[in-house]
């Protein structure tokens, strides 16, 4: 868990209607639509989809260790949910799978064929797992091999955020998500990139 990194983490365990509470918070802060990680071990995703179909879209976390069986699972869930992206946590997979590992190539190809972006944690992970699978330099090879892949770096890319910005200049389909950061903590290299390059 990465809770050690955050202050005043809200306790939502005792909320009777988590989906309704989420909608209330979205309305409070002017959020029209939310991107949810599709968790097949919970009924909450189906509830969110059915109660508020216009308010939620889904990214589907994948485990590349399951190979083609995982591809079959993805296809099945895409028929049930409005899946807009796949997502991958390299350091959190078990066994760990690096960003540029051969196990990932079938998923990158799937994303290209289905016009889906892939959201990939990059940089030192918040949870206390080894960081090697998420080193930003590994993204360079993937972008070279899959020039049509929409690859989104998420959760900071630190301490290689300057390299992340440089790679975005190099590869037109490489993007950066500000996930896991409050705006006051955005890395300066990313702010500079946003203000000077591809800002649209």
Which sequence ranges carry the predicted segments?
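An N-terminally biased module of ancient metal coordination in phosphate/nucleic-acid-related enzymes
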Residues: 1-36
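Short, acidic/polar
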Residues: 14-25, 66-78, 161
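Well-ordered, non-membrane alpha-helical segments in soluble/globular domains
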Residues: 16-21, 43, 135-137
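Generic hydrophobic alpha-helical segments
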Residues: 22, 45, 73-74, 139, ...
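A structural motif corresponding to the C-terminal end of an alpha-helix
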Residues: 24-32, 52, 113-114, 145-149
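N-terminal cationic-hydrophobic initiation segments that often serve targeting/anchoring roles
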Residues: 26, 49-53, 78, 143, ...
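Active-site gating/metal-coordination segments in enzymes
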Residues: 32-33, 39-126, 130-133, 170, ...
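Catalytic pocket-lining loop regions of alpha/beta-barrel enzymes
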Residues: 84-85, 98-200
């Amino acid at each position: 868990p990465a809770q050690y990194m955050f202050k005043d983490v809200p306790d939502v365990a005792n909320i009777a209607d988590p989906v309704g509470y989420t909608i209330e918070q979205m309305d409070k802060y002017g959020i029209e639509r939310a991107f949810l990680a599709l968790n097949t071990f919970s009924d909450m995703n189906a509830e969110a989809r059915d109660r508020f179909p216009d308010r939620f879209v889904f990214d589907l976390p994948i485990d590349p260790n399951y190979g083609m069986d995982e591809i079959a699972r993805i296809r099945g869930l895409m028929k049930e949910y409005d899946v807009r992206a796949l997502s991958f946590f390299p350091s959190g997979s078990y066994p760990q799978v690096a960003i540029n590992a051969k196990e990932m190539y079938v998923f990158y190809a799937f994303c290209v064929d289905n016009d889906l972006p892939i959201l990939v944690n990059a940089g030192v992970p918040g949870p206390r797992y080894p960081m090697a699978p998420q080193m930003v330099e590994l993204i360079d090879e993937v972008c070279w091999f899959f020039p049509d892949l929409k690859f989104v770096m998420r959760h900071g890319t630190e301490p290689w955020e300057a390299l992340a910005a440089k790679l975005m200049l190099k590869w037109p389909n490489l993007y950066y998500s500000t996930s896991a950061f409050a705006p006051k903590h955005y890395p300066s290299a990313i702010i500079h990139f946003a203000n000077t390059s591809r800002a649209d």
